[in-house]
Amino acid sequence: MWLGTAASGRGAGASGCEWPWGAVLTAWPGLQHLPVRLRGCTRSRRASLDPGRLQGKDPDWASYTLGVFICLSCSGIHRNIPQVSKVKSVRLDTWEDAQVEFMASRGNNVARATFESKVPPFYYRPSASDCQLLREQWIRAKYERQEFARPERQEPYSAGYREGFLWKRGRDNGQFLSRKFVLTEREGALKYFNRSDAKEPKAIMKIEHLNATFQPAKIGHPHGLQVTFLKDNSTRNVFVYHEDGKEMVDWFNALRAARFHYLQVAFPGASDADLVPKLSRNYLQEGYMEKTGPKQTEGFRRRWFTMDDRRLMYFKDPLDAFARGEVFIGSRESGYTVLDGLPPSTQGHHWPHGITIVTPERRFLLACETESEQRAWMEAFRKVVDRPMLPQEYAVEAHFKHKP
């Protein structure tokens, strides 16, 4: 899906599912059986490519009008824009001489220079593991709308102000209702209103503490977005979607733009490369585990857990507006660690695969249903514990309010 040089990293636009032909043949020797005229035209270019940095699935497809190689998943997206991209199977279809020569003359660098010359630093570049919506809109923005070759088409997410209606899940009744949202960089806030003519917002979400991540499976809609912000130092979840995929991705990138401009002011010496990873974040791990209370004599209860950076939150339901409790997980140097299993004295019936989180204040006993889930959670916890804490994270730790 990505269109980048084979040797570049993701932040520089590395390819997730789109490849230069020389790298394809070098990285996947199984394709060497293809007709000589299709693989020989770029043999002289292979030495300059580093296929070891490639990511994503085998590129068995190609857009012969754009000159890029793509995986099966992205080939379906390209087929939906036939006026721009025409797709063939690398293995199964017949290639004409002119098509082969065009593929040889293109490649990632040429395509990037044409279609990605003006990608804003805040614009989210999806990877092969991102949801269908992000990958589709990235492809359409590049090739169909040509937003990154014509900056005037970036206004929907670059203007610093955005207003519109989104379907929002009710905090208490769980129903999705149309609500007016206003994003204003000048005020540093995202606001929503219960009525279109309301003068006062129902909620004000400060850009400083706001995050957005697509959660289509959890929300039950392919365009579902989870927005979180801090309210009284506790995390508040807002679940929204729009029927138009472009609208939803424009909202997402507008939020990232607002975060980017806020951080530029807050950290004037930081480079774009330093700021971009802080614009939005996906959760390190999510899923059901069982937990017991602070006395560790209470029965284990099934809860939905979310690991958001250093915040471990648990909910009765995945779509709850507020967490039942939050735990700050610091670094090993600050007295935090994670242990495989539960203490021998643990009481009550629980799932068989235990995890013990040790903090300076107490131990948290958790249990997973399967060994693979336990391994995934242990890996997520250890990544956080092994990472040194930043100065601002000590401040968060000091003011953290834990709800047992």
Indicate residue ranges for each PLM-predicted region.
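Disordered regulatory linkers adjacent to lipid/PI-binding modules
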Residues: A159-Y161, F260-F322, F328-I329, E333-P352, ...
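Eukaryotic cytoplasmic intrinsically disordered
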Residues: S127-A159, A217, F239-V276
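Tryptophan (W) side chains
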Residues: W2, W19-W21, W28
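Cys/His-rich, Zn2+-coordinating zinc-finger modules
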Residues: L34, L38-A47, L72-E155
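Short cysteine-rich clusters marking metal-coordination/redox-active sites
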Residues: P51-L54, C71
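Canonical pleckstrin homology
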Residues: N173-R179, A212-Y262, Q296-R302, V338-A398, ...
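Structured beta-rich ligand-binding regulatory domains in large eukaryotic signaling proteins
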Residues: I77-H78, Q83, F181-P216, T235, ...
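Canonical RING-type zinc finger of E3 ubiquitin-protein ligases
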Residues: G56-L66
